[in-house]
Curated annotation (Swiss-Prot):
Trans-acting protein required for termination of DNA replication. Binds to DNA replication terminator sequences (terA to terF) to prevent the passage of replication forks. The termination efficiency will be affected by the affinity of this protein for the terminator sequence. Belongs to the Tus family. This is DNA replication terminus site-binding protein. GO terms for biological process: DNA replication termination. NCBIfam families: rep_term_tus (TIGR02648). One of its GO terms (cellular component) is cytoplasm. Keywords: Cytoplasm, DNA replication, DNA-binding.
Amino acid sequence: MNKYDLIERMNTRFAELEVTLHQLHQQLDDLPLIAARVFSLPEIEKGTEHQPIEQITVNITEGEHAKRLGLQHFQRLFLHHQGQHVSSKAALRLPGVLCFSVTDKELIECQDIIKKTNQLKAELEHIITVESGLPSEQRFEFVHTHLHGLITLNTYRTITPLINPSSVRFGWANKHIIKNVTREDILLQLEKSLNAGRAVPPFTREQWRELISLEINDVQRLPEKTRLKIKRPVKVQPIARVWYQEQQKQVQHPCPMPLIAFCQRQSGAELPKLGELTDYDVKHIKHKYKPDAKPLRLLVPRLHLYVELEP
């Protein structure tokens, strides 16, 4: 597919996403609200995106006001939806849950629009991250040329429906993203960045080429069978633990935005028990089990690329 077809499809899918989000807003707004609880987190100011987070103060909102905040949050996709002092590199987060009473017909209608919304989100992410063929450092320019001010992470995030949950509790998750990669994978990624011929701030084009060339040399010097890992820290994330009494099952969901709980009237579903998200303090985190990690040596800091050392 040529570049212009790709851009046209991206713009078309985004316009469709805006329509479905508006339809979802209207559908949910018309349903009887039986409970709503959202947790506002501090905004991340420009220049502080990469600072380690040690404490987070949580503010709770309930009822109709929480519902309004939650429904608005699903449509907050652009930088102009937030203050000028807020970082454009950090996505907005509003964990919580909105609980609605529904008939079977209303549930099917809501599930259909949520499914369509999530399909459009997934397709947009695929267009931008895969079909564009661009390395990550060039996607920002590509997206903002055609959808100026779009916050891609907010756009990609899926909306999570819950059907007749018994309880919804909240907490925090601290983790790393760990991915095994091959030497060839990394060389291909680096050569793609080198051949793009662009500058990535704060580097000039020449400085960027020099940095990428050094990284390529470091990787090329490794033996072919070297075990490589990308171990990227993920900032602490709000999560929800949802319990279903009938199935005796617990499901854990990432919770960067409100979950939508549907309670079926015909089934006699009761209002789920709702927990609170407490303030986060890194000093008070307790690990139930922390396995011994294999020793690693950092090779390419920018990519969080490590060499796995033999014991």
